[in-house]
Amino acid sequence: MYPAHLLVLLAVCVSLLGAASIPPQPLNLVQFSYLIQCANHGSRATWHYTDYGCYCGKGGSGTPVDELDRCCKIHDDCYGEAEKKGCYPKMSAYDYYCGENGPYCRNIKKECQRFVCDCDVEAAKCFARAPYNDANWNIDTKKRCQ
């Protein structure tokens, strides 16, 4: 084998090892981001919702700071109800449709998938209706979310 071929083979192997160490994004959260984009017609990137208020993003505590944060709390509570039913909301893939009037769940026969899709669609529509206050992005949750 030629030395150049060995270098290419080595580079491919190293690349594959690096890719294998990247944790996968739960499929449902990817779908949820698409639903948000569908509901708000692409007017705000989904990362704006990952660290907003007391409930948008990982975890949550205290009193929601505004209407948008209440949408996130309701979504968190909905996922909590899904877990009580034995569902895995962050891993449940489902079929949805993005129409002129926003996202809809479609052709879902399994109870968990339907429940989680409904949680996500309602949250995405709530996000689209709620005003976005830049002052509530990346807040100090230790002070404001008691």
Swiss-Prot record:
GO terms for biological process: arachidonate secretion; lipid catabolic process; phospholipid metabolic process. One of its GO terms (molecular function) is phospholipid binding. It is an enzyme of class 3 (hydrolase). InterPro entries: PLipase_A2 (IPR001211), PLipase_A2_Asp_AS (IPR033112), PLipase_A2_dom (IPR016090), PLipase_A2_dom_sf (IPR036444), PLipase_A2_His_AS (IPR033113). Its EC number is 3.1.1.4. Ca(2+) binds at Y55, G57, G59, D76. The active site is at H75, D120. Disulfide bonds join C38-C98, C54-C145, C56-C72, C71-C126, C78-C119, C87-C112, C105-C117. It comes from the Eukaryota. Expressed by the venom gland. Keywords: Calcium, Disulfide bond, Hemostasis impairing toxin, Hydrolase, Lipid degradation, Lipid metabolism, Metal-binding, Platelet aggregation inhibiting toxin, Secreted, Signal, Toxin. Residues 20-27 form a propeptide. It catalyses: a 1,2-diacyl-sn-glycero-3-phosphocholine + H2O = a 1-acyl-sn-glycero-3-phosphocholine + a fatty acid + H(+). It is found in: Secreted. Snake venom phospholipase A2 (PLA2) that inhibits collagen-induced platelet aggregation. PLA2 catalyzes the calcium-dependent hydrolysis of the 2-acyl groups in 3-sn-phosphoglycerides. Belongs to the phospholipase A2 family. Group I subfamily. D49 sub-subfamily. This is Acidic phospholipase A2 S5-32M. It comes from Austrelaps superbus.
